[in-house]
Regions:
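Metal-dependent nuclease catalytic cores that hydrolyze phosphodiester bonds in DNA/RNA
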Residues: 1-133
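Conserved catalytic cores of phosphodiester-cleaving nucleases, focusing on short active-site segments
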Residues: 118-169, 186
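Beta-sheet entry/capping signal
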Residues: 87, 121-122, 135-137, 197-203
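Short, flexible loop/turn elements at secondary-structure junctions
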Residues: 92-96, 124-128, 142-145, 206-209, ...
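Context-gated lysine
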Residues: 17, 40, 57, 66, ...
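Residue-level signal for functionally critical sites in structured catalytic/ligand-binding pockets
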Residues: 13, 91, 118-121, 140-144, ...
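Generic secondary-structure transition motif, activating predominantly at the C-termini of alpha-helices
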Residues: 54-58, 98, 143, 250-254, ...
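Metal-dependent nuclease catalytic regions and adjoining charged, substrate-binding loops involved
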Residues: 151-181, 185-278
């Protein structure tokens, strides 16, 4: 079972009920709220505006056709990752078919990540590895301000005419932690495939569509003075827990006599917590 970039952030009860629906009465599931529908609509509008603006820049951009089937998207993504001259890939889709095609194109053993499927908004070429193959960094488009005050973290603010993180202006601040967790998912998948940077660069384009807020996951600190670790390590822990919840829920779906995979816990987060839950 491959999980997407939201899994590490989702409530365990939501995961439990999603993967063991036969163990619950879900007939009175709450409808999605008007607020959530409007937030999604505004997010789609912002993403379209950001991409429209990006296409006006003098950059080599490859767009994966969103009307293709999943297999075609994955094959096109693999070709783009390995053989294209593109500086930016829009709409990449990375799962098993893409992984197998990458192995074919590079002549090396398939580097599979059986736990993840990745669909980043953008992938930006940030260099080449010792093998001569491109290295990519994931970038998401967000309609909110992705930058938070934090004295223990660093960002590198770049513009489209000098888009690499190494060309960005260093700033003492931190990416939104939910955004960082989603980007960590994509980074970890790329790392497994040998296509990520050693520095762990990820980025967000927020309300200011002319700026890329780059960060190193290891410099995205949690807790006072970074004593609670960094966003990359935190994501790996939460994703591992999510995998266990899903596995237990799938087992319970087959055998309802098994104990619950998780217990309810109030979580106020509007995007991923109880405020957004339809169960």
């Amino acid at each position: 079972m491959r999980l997407d970039a939201r899994a590490a952030l989702q409530c365990h009860e939501f995961l439990h009920k999603s993967f063991a629906p036969g163990c619950f009465d879900l007939s009175e599931r709450a409808p999605e709220s008007e607020m959530m529908r409007e937030l999604k609509r505004q997010g789609d509008i912002h993403e379209a505006r950001t991409i429209e603006n990006l296409m006006t820049k003098n950059l080599d951009i490859l767009v994966i056709n969103k009307d293709q089937g999943e297999i075609e998207k994955e094959l096109t993504t693999a070709e783009a990752l390995i053989n294209s001259t593109a500086q930016i890939i829009i709409g990449a889709w990375i799962s098993s078919v893409c992984e197998e095609k990458i192995a074919e194109l590079t002549g090396r053993e398939t580097a599979s990540d059986p736990d993840r499927v990745s669909r980043p908004d953008l992938l930006i070429r940030v260099g080449e590895g010792a093998d001569g193959k491109p290295r990519w960094a994931p970038v998401d488009i967000k309609s909110h301000d992705p930058i938070n005050e934090n004295k223990s973290s660093k960002l590198y603010l770049a513009t489209w005419d000098s888009l690499l993180p190494t060309e960005g202006v260093e700033t003492i601040a931190r990416l939104d932690l939910d955004d960082a967790a989603q980007l960590a998912h994509y980074y970890e998948h790329l790392r497994t495939l040998g296509l990520a940077t050693d520095e762990g660069f990820v980025g967000v384009i927020g309300r200011d569509i002319e700026t890329i807020a780059w960060a190193k996951l290891s410099e995205t600190a949690l807790g006072l003075g970074g004593k609670a670790g960094d966003a990359g390590v935190d994501y790996l822990f939460k994703f591992d827990v999510a995998k266990k919840i899903v596995a237990a829920a799938q087992a319970r779906q087959k055998d309802p006599s098994l104990p619950p995979a998780a217990y309810s816990a109030l979580e106020s987060d509007a995007k991923f917590g109880c405020g957004a839950c339809t169960f």
